[in-house]
Amino acid sequence: MKRLLILAASGIALAATPALAQDFALSGVTLATGDGSEPIENGAVLVRSGKVVYAGPASGMPESPVQLIQVPEDTWVTPGLFATVTTLGLWDVGAVSESNDTRAGDSPFNAALDVSRAINPASQHIKIHRAAGVTRAATVLSTTGSIFGGQGTVIDLGDDADPVTTPRAFQVVHLGENGARLAGGSRVATYAEFANALREARDFANGRWDAESAMLTRADAEALVAVVNGRQKLYVAVERASDIRAVLGLKREYRSLDLVLVGASEGWLVAPEIAAAGVPVIADGLDDLPRSFEELASTQSNVGRMAAAGVKVAINASAMENPRNLNQYAGNLVALTRVPGADGLSWGQAFAAISSVPAEISGLGGRAGTLTPGALGDVVVWDGDPLEVGSVPVAVYIDGVAQPLENHQSRLRDRYRDLDESDLPKAFDW
């Protein structure tokens, strides 16, 4: 019912103007700006020409001729969620290889792979996650033929044909156990391959690359030049504390590397070192089981302890294909603050970890994942506290454009909600 009220009051005509940014305002709502602060009661947000103009207490909103959308009193408004390290847009059915572009294990190229060219904006997974409040995501391959996972891209989940926000936003490298498997069976081989690749990329940049003796393809060497020069972020997938220390040590030899740790299940053990190095972390929200030997020290308090040590931490939703659960993970981290002996996050910290922090790590700091003047008009209207599992989005805007929330799952829900079979197709009549 709330969803119908909001959409009707706003006068949204999606079919008539699917790509036009709308000028609108919401007032009298509980507002979360995504900057780590606590929610604002009786807040307001004003969006014009696809950008946020104002977000704060309703009493301070400037007068404007834009449409004021009427909403129920218990409505919450937040920036769109930012999902990072996902496979959104790269697959339809996991078990159908023709529809699954997440793996490239047989490709002769690795670091040169660019996922931005394969994004399918019509994917049902994009529509489902948009309906869950995710407005932007960083998409990567899950598997390649080497320790390098290729170049990830940042996308928006808007209902249009141009999803790419930032192509080739970052490079991925797998170290630890997974990297050891890909490099020949040992971490020793992993770090040798990694160091050699960086040297060859540096030689390529300096005009000293020898194609005959090089282990990298020319395309891979060229792709890694941006990493060596610090123009492209390097997402390093590691879990074990000793592997994290080894990665941090790389900056002593390659000072230009712009590192991001991904996973870091044992990050809490070396949190002061991570903070001192100024390296951000994308961590699974609630891993607490030793699924492997490199995760023996996993704990649900990992994120909270790293944040307390001064580490910039974004929350990943554990499964790359299900980032729609981000707000649930963030909410559980808030609940952890009430568990004796556990370390969680405040409400503001938890929401920032799924909005502004991943946006900043992905190169969109101040533009996405936040409701501040000048930011992109990615706005989500919720029927309650977004970190409570029972709350759902009732309206989603991306770049100020109202988005459809219908998807394959919602249509199935609506079709079979009623047990009346009178309107079923004749094929169902046995």
Task: Write out the residue ranges for each language-model feature.
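C-terminal cap of metal-dependent C-N hydrolases
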Residues: 29, 33, 38-43, 360, ...
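Histidine-rich, glycine-flanked metal-binding segment
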Residues: 35-78
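His/Asp/Glu-enriched, well-ordered alpha-helical/loop segment
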Residues: 93, 100-105, 111-112, 233, ...
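Polyanionic/metal-chelating signatures
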Residues: 125, 130-257, 392, 429-430
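Catalytic beta/alpha-barrel core
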Residues: 235-239, 257-266, 290-292
